[in-house]
């Protein structure tokens, strides 16, 4: 790629670019912007999400057994002090837990829920900040 100056000095700059593709496992799918289009989450699997300006991302977890589950998330942004709101809802859209994840906080518990086999919990992630990434995970409570 060559960039040239528009001035009379006739400068030219030569640049080489290399594009490397990196596949991210368990990346959210768009459009997961509502309960009806929520991405399905499996137990003990880390999921990656990309938060965009005025974005809302939904996930759903269906309990494989009757037990308590803990939902954790991390805001992976380290440079901009962006925040992310995380909320857990049941089928009736009743809020079970809610918290804010700030840049640099590390993994944080969103909530602990007792679910029967087949019951669902919805996770809503939202932000009014610019683009950044986050991760989430559901585990059984020991």
List the predicted regions and their residue ranges.
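Predominantly extracellular/luminal regions of secreted and cell-surface proteins
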Residues: 18-43
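Acidic, Ser/Thr/Pro-rich low-complexity intrinsically disordered segments
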Residues: 2-16, 21-23, 50-142
């Amino acid at each position: 790629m060559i960039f040239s100056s528009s001035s009379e000095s006739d400068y030219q700059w030569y640049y080489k670019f290399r594009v490397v593709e990196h596949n991210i496992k368990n990346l959210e799918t768009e459009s997961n912007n509502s309960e009806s289009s929520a991405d399905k989450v499996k137990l003990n699997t880390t999921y990656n999400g990309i938060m965009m300006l005025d974005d809302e991302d939904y996930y759903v977890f269906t309990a494989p057994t009757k037990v308590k589950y803990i939902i954790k998330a991390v805001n992976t942004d380290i440079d901009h002090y962006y925040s992310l709101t995380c909320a857990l809802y049941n089928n009736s859209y009743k809020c079970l837990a809610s918290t804010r994840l700030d840049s640099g906080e590390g993994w944080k518990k969103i909530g602990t829920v007792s679910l029967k086999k087949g019951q669902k919990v919805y996770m809503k992630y939202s932000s009014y900040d610019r683009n950044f990434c986050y991760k989430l995970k559901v585990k059984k409570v020991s």
